[in-house]
Design a protein with these regions (language model features):
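Conserved N-terminal segment of class I S-adenosyl-L-methionine
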Residues: 1-97, 103-107, 123, 243-246
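Short N-terminal helix/helix-N-cap motif within the alpha/beta-hydrolase-1
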Residues: 51, 73, 114-118, 148
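Conserved catalytic loop of SAM-dependent methyltransferase domains
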Residues: 51, 178-227, 241-245
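A short SAM/SAH-binding and catalytic strip from SAM-dependent methyltransferases
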Residues: 103-117
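A short glycine-rich, Lys/Arg-flanked "PGG" loop and its adjoining helix->strand segment in the class I
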Residues: 120-135
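Short, glycine-/aromatic-enriched active-site segment of Class I SAM-dependent methyltransferases
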Residues: 136-158, 164-167
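A SAM-dependent methyltransferase catalytic signature shared across enzymes that methylate proteins
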Residues: 166-182, 224, 228, 251
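C-terminal lobe and adjacent flexible extensions of AdoMet/dcAdoMet transferase-like proteins
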Residues: 225-253
């Protein structure tokens, strides 16, 4: 990622439709298996600029939320928000003992690991640091054929099918609780933005950037679209059959 991308992310994470809506979807899946308790230990594996660290405190109660990221620049934004339990480290080599955490989240981190097979190492590390019965929430960008300049700008090296992500979680030893695509309503928009416009040179760079003032009105309806998906996913064992993100919720036996 470029330095300006970290600044954009930090600016947008609190109220930009994608971040707000995807947190709603995360809650829809996590809430049934992470009931409030007073001492849950939580790790955000690849915390970026820290937008999810404060949000994850809802699952920690009086416990702790730790964050790791491979880049010092990203962690500097976390520190500016007052977060202290931060470590600069790779997702493929977590600096924690076995069975340390009750919940580990990985938001679009596996897709940024460049070495072939290293995503499997990262999943194995999540398994290692979780306590028996601990929960893993793993999300990654979906569909390799949807790669675009947005992925290059955000250092996304691979996009997953849901079947591939679930298969790798199972291979690491996880019990799969839920799996689904997400950001489904907006897949047609992404197809136009990233594939059609790209071919005629009108779609370049990352989609993560401040919204022009003339278009800020779309933030609310786009947020509402993702909230509608979250409401659907709260209905028992429902899932979405396609979307821009692949999600796997799993438990360490």
């Amino acid at each position: 990622m470029q330095p300006e991308d970290f600044a954009y992310l930090s600016e947008l994470e609190s109220d930009f439709w994608w971040f707000v809506g995807m947190r709603e979807i995360t809650a829809a899946l996590l809430d049934p298996v992470c009931a409030p308790r007073i001492d849950r230990q939580v790790l955000d594996d690849g915390s970026g600029t820290g937008g999810n660290l404060s949000w994850l405190k809802r699952y920690a109660g009086n416990g702790e939320v730790a964050g790791i990221d491979v880049t010092a620049e990203a962690l500097s934004f976390c520190k500016k928000q007052g977060h202290q339990l931060l470590v600069q480290a790779s997702a493929t080599d977590l600096p924690f003992p076995e069975s340390r955490f009750d919940l580990v989240t990985s938001f679009d981190v596996l897709v940024q690991i460049p070495e072939v097979g290293s995503d499997e190492s990262a999943i194995s590390e999540i398994f290692r640091v979780l306590k028996p019965g601990g929960i893993a929430f793993v999300r990654g960008a979906a569909y390799e054929w949807l790669k675009s300049d947005h992925d290059a700008a955000l250092a996304t090296h691979h996009r997953y099918s849901l079947e591939e992500l679930v298969g790798k979680m199972k291979a690491a030893g996880f019990e799969i609780l839920r799996s689904t695509y997400a950001n489904s309503f907006l897949l047609p928009v992404a197809l136009v933005r990233r594939l059609v416009l790209k071919r005629i040179g009108l779609a370049r760079g990352s989609d993560v950037k401040p919204m022009p003032s003339a278009l800020r009105w779309v933030n609310a309806p786009l947020t509402a679209a993702l909230r509608a998906e979250a409401a659907w996913l709260r209905r028992g064992e429902t899932k979405l059959g396609f979307g821009l993100s692949a999600i796997c919720l799993a438990r360490k036996p």
